[in-house]
Structure formats: C-alpha cells, structure tokens
Amino acid sequence: MRTILNEMFSCLNEGKEIYLPSKFWQQLNEKNIAQLEASGLHNLKRTLAKNYFTFIVGLRNDQFRHLAAEAGLRNWLELLTYFPKKEAETDLDRLQFYKLSVFTRLLWLLAERHDKHKLLNRIDEPKFGNPFPIHFRNRLISQDLANSVLELSSIMEATSLGFENKLTICELGAGYGRNAYVFMKAFPNCKYIVIDIPPALYVSQEYLARVLPERKIMRFHPFKNIGEVRDEFAAADVVFLLPHQAEQLKEKSVDLFVNISSLHEMTQAQIKQYFELINQLTRGYFYMKQWKSFTNNNDGITITEAGYPYDPAWKKLLSRTARAQPAFFEAVYKIAK
C-alpha cells in the first residue's frame, strides 16, 4: 500500500500546486491513512466510510428525525423487529448499533420509495469492506447503497439520460467508490472516470477492482502525457486519475459529471479551478450534492449553495433539499457542448 501511495503523492506533487490537498484534506488524509494501516481495506466500511457518507447518529439528529417522519407509522413495527446480534468486532456499543440499524432501515425505506427503476432490487451491497451487518426484508442493506440510488434517481428525474446509453461518467472525489459501483451496475455500457487525490484514489481503485471483476480497470499510472496510456484508456471501463492528469482528457467528452460532498472541503481557489475543469470536460450534466452551508475552518472559508462559481451558461434543471439529508442541497445543471 505504502509504495502505491508514495507513487501517487509523488505524481500529485509534480502537478499543479492548485490541486495539492487543502488544509482540510491534509488533516483528513492523515486520519484515513492511519485507519488503512490499522484496519486495512477489508474493514473500510466500518472505518473510512464513516469519514465519507456513512453516518453514525443519535435519535435527536436532524437527519434521523427527518427520516423517521418520512417513514410513517405503519412501517415502524417492521423497522423495529428482527435486529441482528451485535458483532464483537463492531466498535459500537449495543445501543449505538441498534440506532444505526434503525437509521439505515429508515433511509432504505426512503430510497425504495423513490427508486422508480427498481435498482435496489437488482444491486446488492458488496461484502468486501465488511459492511455493518444490517438486514431488512431478508437482505443486507447499507446507507451507501441507499444514498447512491437516491442520488441516481434524482439525476434520472432531471435529465434525459437512459440506462442503455453509452455514457462517460466522471466523478470528482469518489470516496471509496460507492457511486461508481452503483452507477456501473445501472449503466452497463458506461465508462467511469474517477478523479481524486490519495489516499482516496488508492482506496476506490482497490475497492472497485474487487467488486467489479467483470469490468476492465485502468489503475493509476504516473503518466505525464495521456498519450502514454491511450490504448489502455480507450479499452478501460473504469479509470483512475489525479486532477492534473484529468486536465488532459478530451474537452466536452463527459456526459455526466458528479460530485458528492467534497467541494466545501477545498479552498475558494480550488473550488473555482474544479468548476472550470467541470465546464471544460462536460458536454452533458453536472450533479452536485453539498452542505447548504459549511464552514471550513482549516482553510478559512464558508460556502453556501449560492456561493459556488457556476458558469452563467449552465442551465439549472434541479435545485432542492436532498431527500434524505435536510442539511444538504442537490442540484443538476445542463452544461453546453
């Protein structure tokens, strides 16, 4: 692991300074690397995932209360029955584990309600990464699978994309790869490009290579010119790039660009740079899901939905409170070719 990470960091340092980790990410990177060294990739859904979009929350949390209100009384008997035994290796106490189970089931119910394409019926939560043992309606469930289906449902609602289309999808900051996994299952003919910095780029690369064995993976290469990997890139279904490498992609070649909850973790200059990159690469749609307001004390900025540097030529197709997270907004933009 260390050899690959060192190679990634070395290549990143040779690129543009604007893409180096913000102070926020420097701190988070240290935590993520420490967790990787202590617990490995095999346990990432109980460690690293909690740094991304798996929430361990109490009953008074606004998201918990929102999901509870959305569930309706008739579902509560089912929600509160057939709890699994807490595994000894789970670092949660019994009460925390039960709260997590109820919360995850509430989120799953919401995702089922908005899953018009029945993706949850045909996409399973991968066992790799050691997900929390939470079951509902005779199957293993997770927050990440539910959230990814909710996000994809919003995209399909706002756009004219079809599941059989031959698409190029690009995600900035893919976490461990939850969206890439779901989107690749939903769009059998798509190419998926992950743009990220280490250690996240390493984590998503290793995770997706394991859970998508049927797909051709182009792992990270420390290339200076994308022509060096032209043939491998053309043949690959999933590609892993550092940000400065992504600048070499063909302009207006991406049908759907995605970012989930990471733009606020950057400096203002970095946010502007990434919006320019999104505009440069995208010929279709941009989906974003972010905090409505977030103060990044490490880098000294506060950002709101209105504060992002949208290009005036972009057409807003959707902007609303995220269905599962009342503190977040989600938006879809049409980007001119």
PLM feature spans:
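A short, conserved alpha-helix within the catalytic core of class I
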Residues: E265-I278
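Conserved beta-strand signature within the Rossmann-like core of class I S-adenosyl-L-methionine
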Residues: T282-S293
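Conserved class I S-adenosyl-L-methionine
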Residues: E164-G175
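S-adenosyl-L-methionine
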Residues: Y207-K250
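Conserved SAM-binding loop of SAM-dependent methyltransferases across substrates and taxa
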Residues: Y176-F187
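Conserved Class I S-adenosyl-L-methionine-dependent methyltransferase catalytic core
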Residues: Q27-E164
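A conserved beta-strand element that flanks and buttresses the S-adenosyl-L-methionine
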Residues: V258
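Core SAM-dependent methyltransferase catalytic element
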Residues: P312-K337
